[in-house]
């Protein structure tokens, strides 16, 4: 009976489709777990705080134009670099059919009266948005690999220092 079941099922395209879909899901899940582990190691090695999921209300992302109600924020790293407090996180965005992306965003705490020179970061390929208490900086639809986080953070902190006053 078991042999007959195998003969029939191995010739069924639905079985093969389910097998490949399951394999793909497992591969993506394992890659995300590995990435989160690398980000956590990066944060711990530098004395930063790491959270796989964090409270979105803390950054008031609902007031930011780049963040949709369907988006999720994951893998947050927070700390201080060159005297500036930051929170780095990954935005998992879904803008409809076949329009999803993940990008790395760095949020800096600023005061409500802080002024930002608009367009100052554009020359570096960076985009930014200011809300009442935060300045958000990112590269368009780019997810920064863990091995590039250190230079990415230093570059953004340096550029933000020149942008705000």
Positions of predicted regions on the chain:
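Membrane-interfacial helical/loop segments at transmembrane boundaries in membrane proteins
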Residues: 1-4
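Hydrophobic alpha-helical transmembrane segments
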Residues: 6-18
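Core hydrophobic alpha-helical membrane-spanning segments
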Residues: 17-25, 109
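Transmembrane-cytosolic junction motif
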Residues: 22-47
